[in-house]
Amino acid sequence: MPTKAKLRFLLITISFEILFKAAISQPIEGKWRGAIHYDNIEVPFAFEVLKSTDSLTELLIISSGDTMEINNARLKGDSLFVPLGVFDSELRIRYTNAEMSGEWHKNYQQLPGPLFTATYKQDIFSNHSVSMAPVEIEDRWRITLMQPSGGISKALGLFEQHENQIASTILTEVGDYRYFEGMIMNDSIVMSSFDGVHAFLFAGSYHVTGWKGRLYYEPGYYENWEAMYDNTYELTDPFELITTEPGASRPYYDILTAGGKYNIINTDSLAGKVVVIQLMGTWCPNSFDQTNYLINWCKSKPEDVKMIAVSYEPGDKSYAHQRLEKYKKQMKIPYPMYVGGSLSKGQAALAFPTIDRINAFPTLVMVDKKGFIRYICSYFNGPATGDYYLQFGTEFEKRIEELRNE
């Protein structure tokens, strides 16, 4: 090959290498607008790329009053893999300088996840007007959720409004929806929430009698909702939704942990103690919030109180044990945790045959020193609910002291 031709070939090769490296440079640091796509519905959320190297990226996912810090996102070529906190899900992304696209994947599900996209330096509701809002939704609203099957459930919406901006949470009798943020535009409202497990879009418009709209949960599924202003409305207290008579029933600990050979609760260690049993799942954000509360409570837990957790997971037992071990390590949980079985409230209820039902994950079952079930906290109001979260702590600790003093 002639010398000039060799030189030209070398220059072309170097140019391609430079262009290739530029194309797969690290994601741009700064604020991004992410979105999960459900068919023609988009669930937006904010995140920030804090720091990026050749192999790792640090991100911060932001949702109203909540943040999820991620310091172990992995770079591989033009792909970015973002594990979503302690949950077994991740964003699988291909990126250019100012755009990302990919999939939101839950590792315990075989089907492909919803589409994910992101754009650099864009507000999460950038396609909406930011004029002054003529309609107000601040304070508390009684919400009715209507399922496609015909089922109806009640909820309480707590809203804070600053001009067009909305911060909110929605409480139900199976747990709260955690942190929403959004906007009011003229007579319409739109709010979103993304926590790594759920991506919710709450959208509607104002009518003469109140608000009406849809709450989108996942591809192909939504519930209609209606909201009426009611500043005295309350849900049933979580400690009163399901009750039991003192001395009426005991937990079946062998059934509780599915009788696994290496997964057995030592009941001798519980004798003469107040026992708190948390029924939970590593896939559940409400369980995550309650577990954080219990971790902190255990720092000053009395010696005559025992705390245990029993988890109900998707997939087989091998997966469940692996998930629970990782979850316990990541969260530095100081109390014993056991695999209870597959993800089923019916399965969880088998260990408590005299109780009407297990209403939700998480559920707390409180057992007195004689071994009888005394109290059941049937759902959890997490930190997004403000005063209701503080009220849970007060009521929980009051019942602990009552059982200790018997």
List where the protein language model places each region.
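Thiol-/selenol-based redox modules, centered on thioredoxin-like
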Residues: 360-406
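Bacterial Sec-dependent N-terminal signal peptides
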Residues: 1-31
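Short active-site neighborhood of thiol/selenol oxidoreductases, capturing the structured segment around
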Residues: 263-294
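Central antiparallel beta-sheet cores of small beta-barrel/beta-sandwich binding domains
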Residues: 27-95, 127-128, 135-203
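Structural microenvironment flanking redox-active thiols in thiol-disulfide oxidoreductases
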Residues: 289-332, 344-351
